[in-house]
């Protein structure tokens, strides 16, 4: 008799996705991050659900409701810090996952890649509206600064900003709608992730060599289930260490001051995972130009499959491209550092140079390296 997992309509879907899925035999630990992102999403939804049970999305009580969660709710402090640091782990996994895709040419699965970019944007939106909810100083001023960027849009900008605010400033209406967005978006992310997986399973996984692996596949279970569990345990270990030893390491001390529209913090800056984009935004002295550069810094990912000039898919055997890839990583780290620094010399010029280099690497240097490597193949 055929196993129920292969015949039952629901079990069959799970079986084809996680058990009998043919997987390349040589994929490395860089392929772990997909499942780790799934784990992060589940953790964030669960911790977020329990936080929402005690949180009040109202300007007069939001800050004290978070304090109440940390002080009075059983293990509330733990749930709150798991959720806050879980977001950081989510972005670490996201950036590693995207980096893997860039390095090994996974972006050639175009539908999967484009949905991935959409997922990145949705997760970023979720993190942004979530950061506003504790209603501390950085929450309030972060919301004010970032929503204000939309006023750079010609003609409709100001109206659009006031429409998003639900008034003439960031206030009660803004907080309430941001809570609504923060609650609904993770479920949209879950649906998008399912579509992401659907398209991936149409083609099967890429592998480090970038060469088709149809002739050498192994079942996902038990080989990669056990490998993913190791990754998951490491992720949980790091998250627990962060949460239990240094819960505020990645946060901003300003957010422990209740929001005050009459007092601006000395340095307004987002969470660490947005600093690279924030640095690109600040490096352009024109408001609209900065907003466009900010958008393009993420949307440039969509153009990457079109910029593939190399005959080889992966960078595994392409030393020039490897050099440029790691230069890009160093550049992103530089931008992240600059985003957290005040706007003064020498940070301004370093930020501008790093921003130029970011776009130059992706749009010009890497495609050129691909062409040069094609020539070298003929030698």
UniProtKB/Swiss-Prot annotation:
Main location: mitochondrion
Keyword Transmembrane: yes
Binding site for heme b b566: 97, 196
Presence of keyword DNA-binding: no
Topology class, membrane: Multi-pass membrane protein
InterPro entries reported for this sequence: Cyt_b/b6_C, Cyt_b/b6_C_sf, Cyt_b/b6_N, Cytb/b6-like_sf, Cytochrome_b, Cytochrome_b_C_euk/bac, Cytochrome_b_N_euk/bac, Di-haem_cyt_TM
Sites where the protein binds heme b b562: 83, 182
Name of the featured protein: Cytochrome b
Source lineage: Eukaryota, Metazoa, Chordata, Craniata, Vertebrata
